[in-house]
């Protein structure tokens, strides 16, 4: 498949599996799952082997697809609202401040925002006034990241339950607009809690081109099943 594919399945609840293309005849395939699901680290190898055999994944994989290396897993910290952000002249950004999304585990956008906010804070307050710069940075993290983080954590809890997960996907599959913007929202083409923070609203926030592929035939597909993938 030349585009991003995402699968939601009961045994990956509060998580998902993905496929996205890489340069050449290569792709990144994997899954993420929240620790609160009760799945043990030792079980992830079994889930991985089973995942590759599921019909929905087999339909996307090439018949002769082969892994380049052994599969790997690692924990992703997501608690930007609970860690120190500064230590005198040191500002923590990205993973160092656990600025990742608790629903998807993504963190590239958050890392960029936190790094830029730290630089802007120093520029605004001056390098000779670390206390003032720290205060500016703290406010920026709250403005740009904390509300999104808490909103995503709340939504992730809803998705733990079958009724919540099915309801969310049915709503997202209502029409082309909801499908397109669900994909954009899910993978953070705009801030997670944008609709709840009017201070970040801007004209065209839901209608811009976005960081997705548009070939004229649609931009996303949602696969919804009652059985695993």
Regions found by a protein language model. Give the residues of each.
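C-terminal helical "tail/cap" subdomain of flavin- and related membrane-associated enzymes
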Residues: 120-229
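FAD/FMN-dependent oxidoreductases across multiple families
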Residues: 13, 35-122, 127
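FAD-binding core/adjacent interface of flavoenzyme oxidoreductases
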Residues: 1
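Active-site substrate-recognition segment that forms the wall
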Residues: 6-38, 92-93
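Residue-level detector of alpha-helix boundaries and kinks
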Residues: 4, 100-103, 107, 153, ...
């Amino acid at each position: 498949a030349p585009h991003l594919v995402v699968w939601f399945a009961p045994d990956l609840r509060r998580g998902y599996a993905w496929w996205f293309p890489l340069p050449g005849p290569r792709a990144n395939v994997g899954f993420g799952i929240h620790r609160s699901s009760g799945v043990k680290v030792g079980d992830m190898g079994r889930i991985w082997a089973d995942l590759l055999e599921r019909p929905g994944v087999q339909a996307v994989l090439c018949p002769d697809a082969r892994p380049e290396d052994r599969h790997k897993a690692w924990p992703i910290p997501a608690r930007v609202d609970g860690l120190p952000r500064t230590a005198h002249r040191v500002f923590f950004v990205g993973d160092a401040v656990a600025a990742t999304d608790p629903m998807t585990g993504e963190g590239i956008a958050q890392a960029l925002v936190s790094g830029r906010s730290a630089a802007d804070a120093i520029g605004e307050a001056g390098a000779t006034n670390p206390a003032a710069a720290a205060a500016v940075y703290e406010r920026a993290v709250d403005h740009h990241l904390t509300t999104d983080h808490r909103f995503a954590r709340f939504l992730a809890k809803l998705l733990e339950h079958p009724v919540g997960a099915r309801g969310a996907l049915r709503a997202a599959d209502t029409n082309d607009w909801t499908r397109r913007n669900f994909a954009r929202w899910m993978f953070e083409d705009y801030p997670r809690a944008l609709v709840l923070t009017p201070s970040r609203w801007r004209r065209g926030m839901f209608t811009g081109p976005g960081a997705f592929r548009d070939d004229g035939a649609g931009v996303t597909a949602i696969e919804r099943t009652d059985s695993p993938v």
